[in-house]
Curated annotation (Swiss-Prot):
Subcellular location as annotated: Cytoplasm
Chief localization: cytoplasm
Protein name: Peptide chain release factor 3
Keywords for the protein's UniProt record, in alphabetical order: Cytoplasm, GTP-binding, Nucleotide-binding, Protein biosynthesis
Gene for this chain: prfC
A GO term for molecular function: translation release factor activity, codon specific
Organism: Desulfotalea psychrophila (strain LSv54 / DSM 12343)
Length: 528
């Protein structure tokens, strides 16, 4: 491994932020970008007084609704480290996209609303992180409002998420009595001034809790802080770095993202603790980031990031080696060499051409319909990275076109949106319908809005009586052909041509599975 490759890997941190909707994820993202100097003013998320839109929510429907429905990738520098931040969809209907994003990160920050504790979406996302043993740092947000007691929040996290909490900061009061946080990690007291947004995170050094300065600064709350910290010393588990890396323990920080309070302390700890890019599993072997040969995979495709150019960008995670502009790589699914001439790096809606990039970096590759989610590019050795699946949809709708002359545009729009993985599209073997499938119902609304805005297609959708879908396969081609011939009314092909069984109920699905025991019915389809 070259010295430069080693240094570049060591200074990279690639992470995602996960939370339930409205826990403050987008606000935290803005503040992190502010510290990184990537933006001059935090995006004033959901503020009516300030018309500026949140930097990471760039799609029209996101700006309208105030939720993140796609994933933004943002790069910034902090303390001589290169940070790649993946802002995941916060709405529960977009778990597929979030799952794929979590395949591209090395660690995550989990945001918890102090008034609500662990919520449903957080539990789902943690399941995904647990599957991959993704290290998690927890930020307990909104301490400037009334909420649960910090010990109760940690008990809630440990109980529902099965991960041990190791507090590295501790709040002093909450709501109207919120005075600040004591950083256990740095032995510093940070005082909170309501209505201000300080990005000076120095704080007051207090190494000895018996220091009279503590009483001077906090008054009666100094006694409470001493009692809390004494209780913690006996009850809370001290941080074990190996347990954090193996995702069995989470360092916990408290703060208020909207007031930019407690954010820098967490960011500093993140830089010190979060892992640099690590090994990745391919079908044939484990790939180390330090290998000289370039490799990586596509985890997301986004259409029309720039409506003026009708472009499609493939989001690509570099797993090993160095990327240089114009380099030739092998596109394994298609079995041909391509040149990566116009790769970009992201700062939400702002993009810049990239001359070189390293393991952990996320680059955008212009895609004219030939790149799919899960594709691997590499030099020399044919590699196929694993674990980037499609999920069987749980909700279905039939598409009805208002103007039949727009059929061509509808086909193009649905195929492109299906390539992004935001929606799945099926054509029944019998009939000319387009059937959309999704993990969550909001995806249908988003798809219709995007068809109208980006493809000038006016369409509506109506319920259809399917309740489950399974991809079908069989090693015995003859048996599969017989199955297809005898069950045409229940079969469709997805946008990539894979045979799919559509069932009207779980009972019907089980009936078919029992009737055809030699046919495999798959809940997920690995992107091949």
């Amino acid at each position: 491994m070259s010295k430069q490759l080693e240094q570049e890997i060591a200074k990279r941190r690639t992470f995602g932020i996960i939370s339930h909707p409205d826990a403050g994820k987008t606000t935290l993202t803005e503040k992190l970008l502010l510290f990184g100097g990537a933006i001059n003013m935090a995006g004033a998320v959901k503020s009516r007084k300030i018309e500026r839109k949140a930097t990471s929510d760039w799609m029209a429907i996101e700006q309208e609704r105030g939720i993140s429905v796609t994933t933004s990738v943002m790069k910034f520098t902090y303390r001589e480290h290169e940070i790649n931040l993946l802002d995941t969809p916060g709405h529960q209907d977009f778990s597929e996209d979030t799952y794929r994003v979590l395949t591209a990160v090395d660690s995550a920050i989990m945001v918890i609303d102090s008034a609500k504790g662990v919520e449903a979406q957080t539990e789902k996302l943690m399941e995904v992180c647990r599957m991959r043993n993704t290290p998690i740092i927890t930020f307990i947000n909104k301490l400037d409002r009334e909420g649960m007691h910090p010990l109760d929040i940690m008990a809630d996290i440990e109980d529902k998420l099965q991960i041990e909490c190791a507090p590295l900061s501790w709040p002093i009061g909450m709501g109207k009595d919120f005075k600040g946080v004591y950083n256990i990690y740095q032995k510093r007291l940070h005082l909170f001034t309501p209505g201000t947004e300080s990005i000076d995170g120095q704080g007051q050094m207090i190494e000895d809790l018996d220091d009279p300065l503590l009483d001077e600064l906090l008054g009666r709350q100094a006694v409470e802080l001493r009692e809390d910290l004494e209780l913690l010393a006996g009850a809370a588990t001290p941080l074990e770095y190996d347990q954090y890396l193996s995702a069995t323990q989470s360092p916990v920080f408290f703060g208020s993202a909207v007031n930019n309070f407690g954010v820098q302390e967490m960011l500093d700890a993140f830089i010190d603790m979060a892992p640099a890019p690590g090994p990745r599993m391919a079908v044939s072997r484990e790939v180390l980031p330090s290998e000289e040969n370039f490799s990586g995979f596509v985890f997301k495709i986004q259409a029309n990031m720039d409506p003026a150019h009708r472009d499609r960008i493939a989001f690509f995670r570099i797993c090993s080696g160095k990327f240089t502009r114009g380099m030739k790589v092998h596109h394994h699914r298609l079995g041909k060499d391509i040149s990566l001439a116009n790769a970009t790096i992201f700062m939400a809606q702002e993009r810049a051409n990239v001359e070189e990039a390293w393991p952990g970096d996320i680059i955008g590759i212009h895609n004219h319909g030939t790149i799919k989610i899960g594709d691997t590019f590499s030099i020399k050795e044919p590699l196929k990275f694993t674990g980037i699946p499609n999920f069987a949809p749980e909700h279905f709708r039939r598409v009805i076109l208002k103007n039949p002359l727009k059929m061509k545009q509808l086909q193009k729009g649905l195929i492109q949106l299906a390539e992004e993985g935001a929606i799945q599209v099926f054509r029944p073997i019998i009939g000319a319908d387009y059937i959309m499938g999704a993990v969550g119902v909001l995806q249908f609304e988003v798809t219709m809005a995007r068809l109208k805005n980006e493809y000038s297609v006016d369409a509506i959708y109506e319920p259809i009586s399917y309740q489950a879908a399974r991809w079908v396969s069989c090693e015995d081609k003859k048996a599969l052909a017989e199955f297809e011939k005898k069950n045409q009314s229940t079969l469709a092909r997805d946008s990539e041509g894979f045979l799919t069984h559509l069932a009207q109920s779980d009972w019907m699905l089980n009936f078919f599975m029992e009737k055809w025991p030699n046919i495999d019915f798959h809940k997920t389809r690995e992107n091949i």
